[in-house]
UniProtKB/Swiss-Prot annotation:
Pfam families: UQ_con (PF00179). Has a role in the DNA error-free postreplication repair (PRR) pathway. The ubc13/spm2 heterodimer catalyzes the synthesis of non-canonical poly-ubiquitin chains that are linked through 'Lys-63'. Coiled coil: none annotated. It comes from Schizosaccharomyces pombe (strain 972 / ATCC 24843) (Fission yeast). This is Ubiquitin-conjugating enzyme E2 13. Belongs to the ubiquitin-conjugating enzyme family.
Length: 148
């Protein structure tokens, strides 16, 4: 099945003008499956880390959001142990007007501003709420250990 023009155009834009700190490229054998490398945002607990993610565009895209998950372990209240991400634009707030680029920038922004009030990992969120300095130290430690 041929790729929709929308996906082809998004791939061209991501290649020509990648978002800062993000490299996103489809695999050669499946142009709906992207390998992502995302730098941790500056002045965050993830600064200096390189995080690997996978993004898959379902057949219904752009009517349905892409499936995205972290492959690199990350200590974050909005990411579970399987790498799934709690982000409203990937669920209830998805709009066909959004693009892959927007999704990736939203994930990078979530790294810079974790939201322990809407967690996917309750244990991490509890620490983040009760002892934020300790949670940030844990996130930095995991970044140094896993996101190199």
């Amino acid at each position: 099945m041929a790729l929709p023009k929308r996906i082809i155009k998004e791939i061209e834009t991501l290649t020509r003008d990648p978002p800062p700190g993000i490299v996103a490229a489809p695999t050669e054998d499946n142009l709906r499956y992207f390998k992502i490398t995302m730098e941790g945002p500056q002045q965050s607990a993830y600064e200096g880390g390189k995080f690997h993610l996978e993004l898959f565009l379902p057949d219904e895209y752009p009517m349905m959001p892409p499936n995205v998950r972290f492959l690199t372990k990350i200590y974050h209240p909005n990411v579970d142990k399987l790498g799934r991400i709690c982000l409203s634009t990937l669920k209830k707030d998805w709009s066909p007007a959004l693009q892959i680029r927007t999704v990736l920038l939203s994930i990078q922004a979530l790294m810079g501003a974790p939201n322990p009030d809407d967690p996917l990992d309750n244990d991490v969120a509890k620490i983040w709420k009760e002892n934020e300095p300790q949670a940030i130290a844990n996130a930095r430690e995991w970044t140094k250990k896993y996101a190199v």
